[in-house]
């Protein structure tokens, strides 16, 4: 019997909402098949089954919340009876005991239960929402098949089954929130049943538990496998590398064999820092080390206040999505911490319009849609090199400013579910054409909710385009812990004084918000003037 629990995947996520079950009780499920889709603050996560088996029970219904550590589903994977998962407790000094000879796992007639828990993969994510189950109780599942999709603050994660077996119980229903440490699913192996899992057990000496998996995407984490009889079984480990998704991606980018890295996380899980410390240039290490300290201090600064109650009269009650809740929390945190000031200007971009029109044909021949945003981004990147304080963050606990030697340019994207701010890593190394291509693909992936957690973390400066909504000026909210954000208005045609004449010109409104604790208005004005100079003379963009 396998209890699949909702795992901690970092980024402050503690819960999720079950959106959709793909299986029902009694269904056979294969390992890796998507069991359920869970919505979290950031993503809709598909949770794959960790085992083959039959779905015995669903832990939550569609629309219900599931918390980290809660059981998503119980799967009969034919392995036997689960024991109660050990509760966290204060550990006293152990009494010395004679070393016992290694025990060999003997076949258990009643089978084993695999308790698949939602794992902590770092990034501050503590919960997620079950979006979709691909298996139901009673289904058979194969190792690697997607059990369920879980939405977290950052990604929609497909959780694959860590073992073959039968689904005995789902820890949560679609739409429910699951927390780190909660059971995602119970998977039965070797004929285990849910009744065996629920049966009281005689106390037995505790043996070394098997390392199973609580998975987000492709990440294996530790878990418990519970013996199906009163005998104590020592089960061999899976041999898979336990690692966070960010660590896996970074290892791949750096060409590091993740199997050779010693993990510092829980039960040896390889984290981002482990990969960076093994083989990473200082440039790659800086984003992690320099952005975390301010973020940790943020929570204590936000004020508390009474919530508005339900008004009297005829009202419609709408539950906000997890993404909208995440946006709400981020905006509240930023406005509570940052005393921002906003500078505005409007510039004549006739030269930029003509320059873009001349370059569009060449861009199209390369399969690139050349937008104004690519030129604006390039101008901002050049200005950030010249004004490094705008590419920094401030730790108000230590009174330290972290000036970053890399530029990860954030692009605010309006999605049907809410605002998401992914970023382009090392954007200053890209040409205008390369920026155009990346901006387009990043926006498409964000709207489709296909971006990774890595693409949503480590930003150093953000551009937001409220011109797409037909707005000229605005007061953009700084993406904490960054120190500034540039708002772009709509390009319009209006009368403009050129020399001693009034002509119709293309104009671009700019709104720059800065953290006034670190950046003064005069500095903001100089930064904005440099961006203005580059956009009114677009050939300068090619000389950088």
From Swiss-Prot:
The cofactor remark states: Binds 2 lipoyl cofactors covalently.
Q: Look at the named UniProt entry and state the broad enzyme category this protein falls under.
A: transferase
User: Which cofactors does the annotated protein need, by name?
Assistant: (R)-lipoate
Where is each Peripheral subunit-binding (PSBD) domain found? 242-279
Any one GO molecular-function label of the UniProt entry: dihydrolipoyllysine-residue acetyltransferase activity
GO cellular component terms given for this protein: cytoplasm
Q: Where is the Lipoyl-binding domain?
A: 1-76, 113-188
InterPro entries assigned = 2-oxoA_DH_lipoyl-BS, 2-oxoacid_DH_actylTfrase, 2-oxoacid_DH_E2_comp, Biotin_lipoyl, CAT-like_dom_sf, E3-bd_dom_sf, PSBD, Single_hybrid_motif
Catalytic reaction(s) noted: N(6)-[(R)-dihydrolipoyl]-L-lysyl-[protein] + acetyl-CoA = N(6)-[(R)-S(8)-acetyldihydrolipoyl]-L-lysyl-[protein] + CoA
Q: Which UniProt keywords apply?
A: Acyltransferase, Lipoyl, Repeat, Transferase
Task: Mention any Pfam family matching this sequence.
Answer: 2-oxoacid_dh
CDD domains per the UniProt record, alphabetical: lipoyl_domain
Q: Which PROSITE patterns match?
A: BIOTINYL_LIPOYL, LIPOYL, PSBD
Q: What is its EC number?
A: 2.3.1.12
What residues make up the catalytic site?
A: 516
What domain of life? Bacteria
Question: To which protein family does this belong?
Answer: Belongs to the 2-oxoacid dehydrogenase family.
What's this chain's function?
The pyruvate dehydrogenase complex catalyzes the overall conversion of pyruvate to acetyl-CoA and CO(2). It contains multiple copies of three enzymatic components: pyruvate dehydrogenase (E1), dihydrolipoamide acetyltransferase (E2) and lipoamide dehydrogenase (E3).
Q: How does it assemble?
A: Forms a 24-polypeptide structural core with octahedral symmetry.
Name the record gives this protein: Dihydrolipoyllysine-residue acetyltransferase component of pyruvate dehydrogenase complex
Q: Which organism is it from?
A: Acholeplasma laidlawii
